[in-house]
Swiss-Prot record:
Residues 148-219 form the LRRCT domain. Keywords: ATP-binding, Cell membrane, Developmental protein, Differentiation, Disulfide bond, Endosome, Glycoprotein, Immunoglobulin domain, Kinase, Leucine-rich repeat, Membrane, Neurogenesis, Nucleotide-binding, Phosphoprotein, Receptor, Repeat, Signal, Transferase, Transmembrane, Transmembrane helix, Tyrosine-protein kinase, Ubl conjugation. ATP binds at residues 519-527, 547. Residues 1-33 form the signal peptide. Belongs to the protein kinase superfamily. Tyr protein kinase family. Insulin receptor subfamily. The transmembrane domain mediates interaction with KIDINS220. This is High affinity nerve growth factor receptor.
Length: 799
C-alpha cells in the first residue's frame, strides 16, 4: 500500500480492463510532465523508479504489471518485508533494486514468480539474514548485500561459500557483522556449519521380479528442517509405501518389476545451511530377451537388434546354425542411447560389403544367469550371380533398355569355334592375377604357407607370374622407372594382414577336373576350358576356366599361393569368381568362372557399327548395342571398381580388354593374364620387361609411376570412352610417344559420336588433372546407374 495517498491520488489510475495495463497508465500519467513528481515514475519502455521517501510499505500495488522488467526502489523506510505475493504477476522482471530502505525480511519463496530475475540489489537495508532458498533456482549474475547488518550464523554459510568462490560479485563487497565494533564478516568463521548428511541403506542385495524392497534414509545434521523421498521415476515400477520421519525415513517398494532397473530412488534433507540429496538404483534381476530386425543397408549393412536382461546378457551370433566368428568385416556394434535409465541395449551386426555368400539365416543368442533367449532373421544382401547351367547355349539376348533405340538386340551363334571361345573366355579370370600383384611381392613374415612353402620376403623380377600380376596393388603405390630390371617389385607393395590372416583357399581334387581344350597362353602358363565335378552342391558338373602354372620353381609356387589367397577374398557379382586351386601333382591349377563371351573389348567391336568390317565375311550381330545397353555395361564395370576401392585395392590396368562378358550381358572385371600378349599394342615397354598401359594412365602415373584409387578413376573414364566408341583404342591415331605427350599436356579424348553429353561429363570428371579433384568411383557409379535406369534421349546429329 502507499502511505498517505491512494493510487488514484498519485495518478495511478487503473483502467476498467484490469491490471494488465498498469505500465501503460503509468507512462500516460507522466507523459506530459516535464519531470515526474509521483511516488513511482516510468523509466524507459519497461522500467519503474520509486524514490519518493516513505511512500511505500509494500510492493503488492505493482502486481499485474506483466511487462515490467526493471524496478528500482529507494528511501522506503516503511518497506520492511518482501513476501512471495508482492511480486506475483511480474514474470518478466529481470532487475530488482531495493536500497536505503527498511527491508528486514525476505521470504524464502519471495521470488517464486520472477524466474527471470538476474540482478538483485538489496544493499543498505536492515537485513540480518538471507536464506539460501531465496536465491535457489535463480540465474543470478549480480547479488549485492553490502551495507546490511548481517548476523554471522549457519544461515549465511551459503553466502560465505559464494564469497569464497567469487560467485555473483559477492567477493567484491564488504559484508559486515552486526556484532560490536562493526567487524567484517569472517570467511569460514563458523566451521561447525554444514549441509545435512544423507545415507540410504538397502539390505536387499539380490532382488528379483515380484520381490519387496526395503530402503531406509538416515539424516544427520544441525537444525534439520525437512526431509523426504523423490520417487518420480518409479511410476508403474512398484507400489510405494512411505513411513517414518526425521532423522530416519523408511520406504517399501512392493512387488517390483523389471522397469525399476536403473531408476533413481532419491532421499533429500534441508537445514539452514543448504540441501543434500542421495540417490540409489535398485537392481532387479530378470531373464534375457532379444529382438531382431530385418537387415538394413547403411554405410555398412546392419542387422538391428535389441537385447534386455539383468545382469546384461552375453551375446553370440550363429550363421546358418554355425557359430559366426566376428572379424573386422562382420562385427557387433552397440548404439549409444540418449536414455541412461533403461537396461535395454540396441545395436547392429555390421557387415562390410557383404556378398551372396553372406546370404542366410542369422540367429542372436542372449543369455544371463536367469535365462536365455534367441531370435533369427533371414538376410539377403546380393543375388547369386552364378545360378545358371554353363553347358546350355548362351544367347546374347538383351532386353531393350533404351526406349528410343531402334537397333535389334544381338543374338549369338550357338556354334562357336573353340578358338573363338578361348579368346572370348580366356581373358576372363585374371582379374585375379592383376589383383594379386600387390601381394606377391610383399610378404616379409616368413611364415609357413598353406601349400607347404616358405614365403620369401621379396619376389624376383624374373618371375613370369609376378609380372603378370604387377598391375594390382593395395592402396596407392609408385614404381620406379627401372622397374622390371633389377629392382623388381621390392618395397612397392605392403601386405595388409587384415585381408589375408584367415583366408581359406578351396582345394579341388584333380580327378574332378577334366580339361577340354586350350583357350590361350600367357607368361604364367596356359588357360584351358574344362569340366569340373562336385564344385557346387546343386550341380554335378560345370564348365570352368583353368589356369595352369607352367613353372614349378619355388618363387612361382609362392606367387601362385599368394594369388590364390587374394582371389579367395574377392567376392562380388562384377568380379570374375575364383573357385579354388588344385595342388595335387602338377602342374598347379587355378579354377575360375567361365565367361562365355570373352573380353569386353572384342565383344564391343563385334557388336558395334564396324562389326561387319572387322568380321571379314563372318556372321555378325544384327545391330550395334543400344544406348541403354552401353550404360548397363559401364554401370557394371563401375560397380566392380567401387567394390575394389572399398577394399583399398588399386587395379592399375583397368581397360575393356581386362573385363569379361557372360550370359545376359553380365560384365565382370577379370582376365587370364593373356591381354598383354593379345593386345600388345595397348602397352608401352619401359626398360626390360615392364609394360605400361600408358593410354589408360593419368599424368601422375606416367610421369612419377604413382598409382592410387584416383588413378583408377582416370582409367575408368578411358574405359567409358572405349565403351561408347565400341572398343576403339584411346588415341588410336597417335603413337605411344605422342599419346604420352597429349596426356601429360592436359589434352582430353574427344566425345564419341554415340556418347550423350551427360556421359561425357562423367568422363571429364574422371580426367581432372589433380587426383583429388576427380570424381569418386561411388559418384561415377551412382550417376551411371541413374542414367541406365532412365537413358537420356540422344540423337547423333553429326553422324
Amino acid at each position: 500500500m502507499l502511505r498517505g495517498q491512494r493510487l488514484g491520488q498519485l495518478g495511478w489510475h487503473r483502467p476498467a480492463a484490469g491490471l494488465g495495463s498498469l505500465m501503460t497508465s503509468l507512462m500516460l500519467a507522466c507523459a506530459s510532465a516535464a519531470s515526474c513528481r509521483e511516488v513511482c515514475c516510468p523509466v524507459g519502455p519497461s522500467g519503474l523508479r520509486c524514490t519518493r521517501a516513505g511512500s511505500l510499505d509494500t510492493l503488492r500495488g505493482l502486481r499485474g504489471a506483466g511487462n515490467l522488467t526493471e524496478l528500482y526502489v529507494e528511501n522506503q523506510q516503511h518497506l520492511q518485508r518482501l513476501e512471495f505475493e508482492d511480486l506475483q504477476g511480474l514474470g518478466e522482471l529481470r532487475s530488482l533494486t531495493i536500497v536505503k530502505s527498511g527491508l528486514r525480511f525476505v521470504a524464502p519463496d519471495a521470488f517464486r514468480f520472477t524466474p527471470r530475475l538476474s540482478h538483485l540489489n538489496l544493499s543498505s537495508n536492515a537485513l540480518e539474514s538471507l536464506s539460501w532458498k531465496t536465491v535457489q533456482g535463480l540465474s543470478l549474475q549480480d547479488l549485492t548485500l553490502s551495507g546490511n547488518p548481517l548476523h554471522c550464523s549457519c544461515a549465511l554459510f551459503w553466502l560465505q561459500r559464494w564469497e569464497q568462490e567469487g560467485l555473483c560479485g559477492v567477493h567484491t563487497q564488504t559484508l559486515h557483522d552486526s556484532g560490536p565494533g562493526d567487524q567484517f564478516l569472517p570467511l569460514g568463521h563458523n566451521t561447525s556449519c554444514g549441509v545435512p548428511t544423507v545415507k540410504i541403506q538397502m539390505p536387499n542385495d539380490s532382488v528379483e521380479v515380484g520381490d519387496d524392497v526395503f530402503l531406509q534414509c538416515q539424516v544427520e545434521g544441525l537444525a534439520l528442517q525437512q526431509a523426504d523421498w523423490i520417487l518420480t521415476e518409479l511410476e508403474g515400477a512398484a507400489t510405494v509405501k512411505k513411513f517414518g520421519d526425521l532423522p530416519s525415513l523408511g520406504l517399501i517398494l512392493v512387488n517390483v518389476t523389471s522397469d525399476l532397473n536403473k531408476k533413481n530412488v532419491t532421499c533429500w534433507a534441508e537445514n539452514d545451511v543448504g540441501r543434500a540429496e542421495v540417490s540409489v538404483q535398485v537392481s532387479v534381476s530378470f531373464p534375457a530377451s532379444v529382438h531382431l530386425g530385418l537387415a538394413v543397408e547403411q554405410h555398412h549393412w546392419c542387422i538391428p537388434f535389441s537385447v534386455d536382461g539383468q545382469p546384461a546378457p552375453s551375446l553370440r551370433w550363429l550363421f546358418n546354425g554355425s557359430v559366426l566368428n566376428e572379424t573386422s568385416f562382420i562385427f557387433t556394434q552397440f548404439l549409444e542411447s540418449a536414455l541412461t535409465n533403461e537396461t535395454m541395449r540396441h545395436g547392429c551386426l555390421r557387415l562390410n560389403q557383404p556378398t551372396h555368400v553372406n546370404n542366410g539365416n542369422y540367429t542372436l543368442l542372449a543369455a544371463n544367469p536367469y535365462g536365455q533367449a534367441a531370435a533369427s532373421v533371414m538376410a539377403a544382401f546380393m543375388d547369386n550371380p552364378f545360378e545358371f547351367n554353363p553347358e546350355d547355349p548362351i544367347p546374347v539376348s538383351f532386353s531393350p533398355v533404351d526406349g528410343n533405340s531402334t537397333s535389334r538386340d544381338p543374338v549369338e551363334k550357338k556354334d562357336e569355334t573353340p578358338f573363338g571361345v578361348s579368346v572370348a573366355v580366356g581373358l576372363a579370370v585374371s582379374a585375379a592375377l592383376f589383383l594379386s600383384a600387390l601381394l606377391l611381392v610383399l610378404n616379409k613374415c616368413g611364415q609357413r604357407s598353406k601349400f607347404g612353402i616358405n614365403r620369401p620376403a621379396v619376389l624376383a623380377p624374373e618371375d613370369g607370374l609376378a609380372m603378370s600380376l604387377h598391375f594390382m596393388t593395395l592402396g596407392g603405390s609408385s614404381l620406379s622407372p627401372t622397374e622390371g630390371k633389377g629392382s623388381g617389385l621390392q618395397g612397392h607393395i605392403m601386405e595388409n594382414p587384415q585381408y589375408f590372416s584367415d583366408t581359406c583357399v578351396h582345394h579341388i581334387k584333380r580327378q574332378d577336373i577334366i580339361l577340354k581344350w586350350e583357350l590361350g597362353e600367357g607368361a604364367f602358363g596356359k588357360v584351358f576350358l574344362a569340366e569340373c565335378y562336385n564344385l557346387l552342391n546343386d550341380q554335378d558338373k560345370m564348365l570352368v576356366a583353368v589356369k595352369a602354372l607352367k613353372e614349378a620353381s619355388e618363387n612361382a609356387r609362392q606367387d601362385f599361393q599368394r594369388e590364390a589367397e587374394l582371389l579367395t577374398m574377392l567376392q562380388h557379382q562384377h568380379i570374375v569368381r575364383f573357385f579354388g586351386v588344385c595342388t595335387e601333382g602338377g602342374p598347379l591349377l587355378m579354377v575360375f568362372e567361365y565367361m562365355r563371351h570373352g573380353d569386353l573389348n572384342r565383344f564391343l567391336r563385334s557388336h558395334g557399327p564396324d562389326a561387319k568390317l572387322l568380321a571379314g565375311g563372318e556372321d555378325v550381330a544384327p545391330g550395334p548395342l543400344g544406348l541403354g545397353q552401353l550404360l548397363a555395361v559401364a554401370s557394371q564395370v563401375a560397380a566392380g571398381m567401387v567394390y575394389l576401392a572399398s577394399l583399398h585395392f588399386v587395379h592399375r590396368d583397368l581397360a575393356t580388354r581386362n573385363c569379361l562378358v557372360g550370359q545376359g550381358l553380365v560384365v565382370k572385371i577379370g582376365d587370364f593374364g593373356m591381354s598383354r600378349d593379345i593386345y600388345s599394342t595397348d602397352y608401352y615397354r619401359v626398360g626390360g620387361r615392364t609394360m605400361l598401359p600408358i593410354r589408360w594412365m593419368p599424368p601422375e602415373s606416367i610421369l612419377y609411376r604413382k598409382f592410387s584409387t584416383e588413378s583408377d578413376v582416370w582409367s575408368f573414364g578411358v574405359v567409358l570412352w572405349e565403351i561408347f566408341t565400341y572398343g576403339k583404342q584411346p588415341w588410336y591415331q597417335l603413337s605411344n610417344t605422342e599419346a604420352i605427350e597429349c596426356i601429360t599436356q592436359g589434352r582430353e579424348l574427344e566425345r564419341p559420336r554415340a556418347c550423350p553429353p551427360d556421359v561425357y561429363a562423367i568422363m571429364r570428371g574422371c580426367w581432372q588433372r589433380e587426383p583429388q579433384q576427380r570424381l569418386s568411383m561411388k559418384d561415377v557409379h551412382a550417376r551411371l546407374q541413374a542414367l541406365a535406369q532412365a537413358p537420356p534421349s540422344y540423337l547423333d546429329v553429326l553422324g
